[in-house]
Amino acid sequence: MEAARMGFRAKTLPHLGNGTRLPLKTKLSLFPMHLLQNHTTLSRRSTKLNLCVKACSKTSGVESSRPLPHSAPDLWGDHILSVPTENSEFDTLETEIESIKPKVRNMLMSSHKTDKERICLIHLLICLGTFHYFEKEIEEILEQAFRKLDMLFTDEDDLETTAIMFEVFRLYGHKISCDVFDRFKGVDAKFKEHLVSDVRGMLQLYEAAHLATPFETILDEALSFTRYHLESLAGQQATAPHISRHILNALYKPRFLKMEIIAAREYIHFYQKEGHDETLLKFAKLNFNFCQLHYVRELKTLTKWWKDIDLPYKLPYIRDRLLETFIGVMAVYLEPHYSLGRIIATKVSQVIVVMDDTCDAYGTFSEVRSLIDSLERWDPGAIDKLPSCLRIVIQSIVETMEDIEREMKPRGRSSSVQDTVEEIKIMGRAYAEISKWARAGHVPTFDDYIELGLDSSGIRCFAMYSFISMEDCEENQTNAWFKSKPKMLRALSVIFRLTNDIAGFEEEMRRGEVVNGVNCYVKQHNVTKELAVREIKKMIRDNYKIMMEEFLTIKSVSRPILVRCFNIVRLVNLYYEEGDNFTNPNGKLKDLITSLFFHPLPL
């Protein structure tokens, strides 16, 4: 990768708030003139419209037949650049956190605490989002406690404590049996009715039941039992308002499927209204605000980079979604020390969105084919032979990856960059084939579609470039596991692909885009859309269980890598819980971005 003109340097890291320029050859928009005149996002440079040229095709008929882009404009502009991130505030937060950490560590390691009490404290740290400061201590405690599992559960009849221990052990990769919940069943093999009065126990059992592996029937039963009764409990006057809100938040989305930083913010509000430990509460608030400052500084770096390469102006059909992309990357890495990882993953994600939109929503089949052929060659010298808009797309991908390789090579992690390039090519080939189907109006069988759809989902690629900067994980071991095509990554891809297809089905069909998992299932099985969605949702649930089974059994790669795979699932739920929130971010996603980047917690 010799052709990149500028790479990361130390001064571009987020704590200095300076952006990395990834220059392209022209500042002119190369989008067709008649579409430019109707595009709402171009008001900042209207004086340049007379310089625009047609993007790809030489045939005006092709240009006039292109559909106008349907995505909403960027919601945020440059607002993030005005958010204060003073060094003094940053230093104050860091100093306070460092002063409290030993106190929390002493609570955790105290010889006066039983194993159960330590595990319950670990659970509280997970809920408050502060667990990452004590990973070594937590792993040591759980390793020792797991050796005494029988003693831990002997005579334990408290539902909340049992469910907490089950959840914590599973989250840290210990394969605890779901049989620990048998004691809460009656002679009729159903959960005992008196459990319903234990609101906290019911809520904790509900959360724990989401960590099921295949064939764990008791956890399926627990989920149905708790969901049914919690819906009723949330509406009862006898239930305290803050507990009702906590129940409703969990029923809307369990903690396991929420971004960790979002779950932490919610739980901090809940914990504050409970009988709480002031030290732990303050520590959680300081951590949230400290993470928030980190994220905003990283976003300032990324915003300057995004403005420099100026792709939304040059290619106005693309979805301009920098903050929305970044919040998805945050789902993968909560911890402040993964700043470089968040920057790298956001940059790669942004240029892949550009490629996706070009193939999916703008290019003709011949243009898509040319784009992917050039991508396969990965030859900077051949870029100038491409039509103008394709040249910009390829250049943005190639130069971004070259920048990243330049940054990672001195760190000894360049092979992950090369593997990411290969994954981008695989994704590109899938885009081309799906584009061929779509332009021909061909609806493949669901079985044919799903294999190609997994590649086009980009989730394997996303996982690969999420690992690039994880210097605490051995690169060769991680890459070898990745190349073995593990069941965990396949299950993750299925979850993303099918969740995306359900969320986008109605809009895609309105646009005449018939190559969608739901539509393919309807065709192959000759069923209604409603039945197809129901069956596909069952496939999604089954693949969650496969992921958990793999998480508990894989020994060939370190736990942090497996955790990132689960965190990508949180991204899926963030983007596609109610429609396509990435394409249309007004609503819940907009509110989440506002709360995470613009509203610190009062101390």
Swiss-Prot record:
GO terms for biological process: diterpenoid biosynthetic process; terpenoid biosynthetic process. InterPro entries: Isoprenoid_synthase_dom_sf, Terpene_cyclase-like_1_C, Terpene_cyclase_plant_C1, Terpene_synth_N, Terpene_synth_N_sf, Terpene_synthase-like, Terpene_synthase_metal-bd, Terpenoid_cyclase/PrenylTrfase. Pathway: Secondary metabolite biosynthesis; terpenoid biosynthesis. Mg(2+) 2 binds at residues 356, 360. Binds 3 Mg(2+) or Mn(2+) ions per subunit. It holds the Pfam family Terpene_synth. Mg(2+) 3 binds at residues 500, 508. The keyword Cell inner membrane does not apply. A motif (DDXXD motif) lies at residues 356-360. Mg(2+) 1 binds at residues 356, 360. It is found in: Cytoplasm. Its cofactor is Mg(2+); Mn(2+). Its EC number is 4.2.3.-. It is an enzyme of class 4 (lyase). One of its GO terms (cellular component) is cytoplasm. Keywords: Cytoplasm, Lyase, Magnesium, Manganese, Metal-binding. GO terms for molecular function: magnesium ion binding; terpene synthase activity. CDD domains: Terpene_cyclase_plant_C1. Predominantly expressed in siliques but also in flowers. The Asp-Asp-Xaa-Xaa-Asp/Glu (DDXXD/E) motif is important for the catalytic activity, presumably through binding to Mg(2+). Involved in terpene biosynthesis in roots. Possesses sesquiterpene (C15) synthase activity in vitro. Does not seem to be involved in diterpene (C20) biosynthesis. This is Terpenoid synthase 22. The gene is TPS22.
